């Protein structure tokens, strides 16, 4: 008998006594694919009957088409980033000679806002279809503007109104090929770039004369409520122009981000065109007649604030009644007037400023300031007394430009530079915009707006005044003088305000040409003059 260990070994090496059924040892193999010939079958002949949708041959043919190697499409850069070779001299000369922008020598600003290329057939088609509707809504005669003026007199600005009015309505629409052409796109953007500053100056002059005792803060609120971007679509619809701006959309159902930018661009460009062709009086007529704006409407009133008591006199022409837009638009200064804009000067410089005549500042600092600014300018007056009176008023206006609000504003709210600063800020914006338009004929409006913003930054305005060492003559209140003179966070805005007030005074006394002289010759805003070593 074998030992137990050997018995266990024999048991372990032997087969199991329980046989498994043969059916369970089979493995089930499932067919997951069908082997097929990968060569595509020939296409069916036209005479053969159409194959059903689930035909194997049709499915194999489509699979073979999908398996074909397709090279990936190369991603080309956008067209605006593709560098083009410069034009040769002959083509460049031809382009400039055929450009309408160089066709008017007598009207350089209007000429610079004309399209950079002649209008195409698509442009003329739009003008034939829709221009009469726009002119009727704005209150203009329906005859073509080319018939205005004497004969072939291109010096008449109104002759170019049809072209500029067409450009004003061509806001950029990505689905419209006509508005994406270069001469239309740039022409429209250049018009809205000019028009925004025209509107700001128009309302500034109007409100300064309508509210002779009010500070500029409430006036800015009125302007924003009237022509802010939220209110502009309402005015577009009030003038029945919404079908021209949004021909395929319902203005009331559009969301804000789709409705406001095109309406704002068309509104600004419209007043740029009107200003170029007819001047500022026509801007007032279209604002208050065609669009129906009401400065006394409840929606555009400034918020209530604590008002300082104004005990000083205003000029006689403002005491009788409140001026209307017709008074401002129809006003023409008399031939022997002291100033270029007499009523605007009276609205900004109170009559009580004569009490400061002959004080220490007038005796010590006024001659130095006038010498730096090149005042008084030579004028051809019939009567010498007119020249003398103008120079006296100019000296008082200069003293008001340097009169900081901390000095007298609490007791006498208008004995400070705020109202002159308001008009100066708007006129310097417009003068710089006109300068950039005439200087950069090819530039679109967005590029000009960025250039304009960089040239007129507040820190630069004050710096130009400090470069002329005029900030030493600012009259501060005794309690804050040390802080303003030694803290640049306080000093820089105050010098900027004085700079803008000087521009406002120059506009009131001598007109827009003197603002250009101060900005580009005296203060050198463009920084192109050589620096003293």
Curated annotation (Swiss-Prot):
Gene name on record? Answer: RNC1
| Species the sequence originates in | Oryza sativa subsp. japonica (Rice)
Protein name in UniProt? Ribonuclease III domain-containing protein RNC1, chloroplastic
Q: Taxonomically, which superkingdom?
A: Eukaryota
Give a GO cellular-component term. Answer: nucleus
What subcellular compartments does it reside in?
Plastid, Chloroplast
Comp. bias regions, Basic residues: 69-82
User: Which CDD domains does this UniProt record tie to the protein?
Assistant: RIBOc
Question: What exactly does this protein do?
Answer: Binds specific group II introns in chloroplasts and facilitates their splicing. Acts on both subgroup IIA and subgroup IIB introns. The substrates of the subgroup II also require the CRM domain proteins CAF1 or CAF2. Binds both single-stranded and double-stranded RNA non-specifically, but lacks endonuclease activity. Required for plastid ribosome biogenesis.
| Composition bias type Pro residues, residue spans | 39-53
Which terms in the Gene Ontology molecular function aspect does this entry carry? double-stranded RNA binding; ribonuclease III activity
Domain RNase III, which positions? 164-279, 411-511
Instruction: Give all cystine bridges in this chain.
Output: none
Q: Which GO terms describe its biological process?
A: mRNA processing; regulation of gene expression; RNA processing; RNA splicing
The transit peptide of this chain lies at 1-30
Matches recorded under InterPro entries? RNase_III_dom (IPR000999), RNase_III_sf (IPR036389)
SUPFAM superfamilies, per this entry? RNase III domain-like
Q: Which SMART domains match?
A: RIBOc (SM00535)
Q: Which UniProt keywords apply?
A: Chloroplast, mRNA processing, mRNA splicing, Plastid, Repeat, Ribonucleoprotein, RNA-binding, Transit peptide
Task: Map out region (Disordered) in residue numbers.
Answer: 31-57, 66-85
What do we know about how this protein assembles, alone or with others?
Answer: Interacts with RNA. Part of large ribonucleo-protein particles that contain CAF1 and/or CAF2.
